[in-house]
Amino acid sequence: MKRLARSLYLQVLLAVVLGALVGHLFPATGASLKPLGDGFIKLVKMLIAPIVFATVVTGIAKMGDLRKVGRVGLKGLLYFEVLTTVALAIGLVVARLARPGAGMNVDPATLDTKAIASYTNGAQAHGTVDFLMNVIPRDVADAFARGDILQVLLFSVLFGAALAALKDKGRPVLEFVDGLSLVLFRIVGFVMRLAPVGAFGAMAFTVGKYGIATLLSLGKLIACFYATSALFVVLMLGLVLRWCGLSLFRFLRYIKEEIFVVLGTSSSESALPLMMRKMEKLGCSKPVVGLVVPMGYSFNLDGTSIYLTLATLFIAQATNTHVTLVQELEILAVLLLTSKGAAAVTGGGFITLAATLSAVGNIPVAGLALLLGVDRFMSEARAITNLIGNGVASVAVSRWEGELDQARARAVLAGTVPEEVEPANEPEPPAIPAGAGLHG
């Protein structure tokens, strides 16, 4: 009992199991518990924008050399593009080999498309230009109020750059933002005590509303997706961590609390503040974490990428739509564009799928109706894979920059360094280099 009282991940795991039981045995009660999960996620999202702001601003201001900021951002984007391309390709290959939709013989004309109307309408405004324009906020207050991570990130980079350019004159502001960061992470600690309650409510709602029968009806698709996500984590992300000199399984054990929070809430954002703190304590460069992790929530959605290609070919197979190899490559190319920013809008995965199917043309968009019932059961694997992918990304880019404290990272993963100890490579606050400026 003492271990349960001290261990957040055990509390969340127990809450997930109890929530599933309540949802299965008492469906109406389980469905009514949705506010518990929603409330917890809202509490976390309340903190994400200010935490991203404080972390990015202090990281850039202390870094001083703004050319380095650009270099880190470019390396992060390059890493994201390579890994998401691999994730999309793996989903495509598994769908070809496993054929989860084969034999369903669904007539698209018989499907009820009313439920997917909002997603197909949203696909009309999901182009690349719209996405890029959406990165620029109408005003700063609006970006923070809506919690738009990319808009907050853009403003934070500009604010940090301006602070670095001010040199000594900016020190009081930097001290304030640095202190604000400490306060925000302390609030995160308070909020995370409610994680078991949120996980219980979210899992009870999922099972109570959709039922186990829904899970079994498209079991092959769900099994394919979970297996593919696990394969990607073990092979690709494991390979990246090996290049960084670290063990994947020790890394997963290190972030187990965050994984179970995401498992219970089906939202990778619910663990974003904790993940940023964990990566810093692991020995990653604070400026790298501040830039890479928030960017990753729009550009490095590995789990979502696997889901998109798998779901696209599933719909084609279920509706007996023949897709040639050339068309599959076209799907891959379209998804490389449409998948960016899939997390920036509600129902982003479905909107991205609708946009892709519309662009490809020969796969019926009405087939999205097949996924509505089981999509919720795949969201946990999507969110967990996204979470792990963004954690590994911060380690990889730190290693690429030569700013990963590998000795500390190995010690932390081995459990020989208390997680509460601050990382050795974090800059001492709040010194701004005398020569810092916009041209570094």
From Swiss-Prot:
Query: Which stretches are transmembrane?
Result: 8-28, 40-60, 74-94, 147-167, 187-207, 221-241, 288-308, 354-374
Q: Transmembrane helix: is it a keyword of this entry?
A: yes
Compartments where located: Cell inner membrane
Record has Acetylation as a keyword: no
Quick one: a GO biological-process term for this protein?
L-aspartate transmembrane transport
- GO molecular function, a single term: malate:proton symporter activity
Topology in the membrane? Multi-pass membrane protein
Q: Name one Pfam family in it.
A: SDF
Q: Which InterPro entries match?
A: C4_dicarb_transport, Na-dicarboxylate_symporter, Na-dicarboxylate_symporter_CS, Na:dicarbo_symporter_sf
UniProt similarity note: Belongs to the dicarboxylate/amino acid:cation symporter (DAACS) (TC 2.A.23) family.
The role this protein plays is: Responsible for the transport of dicarboxylates such as succinate, fumarate, and malate from the periplasm across the membrane.
Task: Please give the name of this protein.
Answer: C4-dicarboxylate transport protein
Species whose genome carries this gene: Anaeromyxobacter sp. (strain K)
Q: Which gene encodes it?
A: dctA
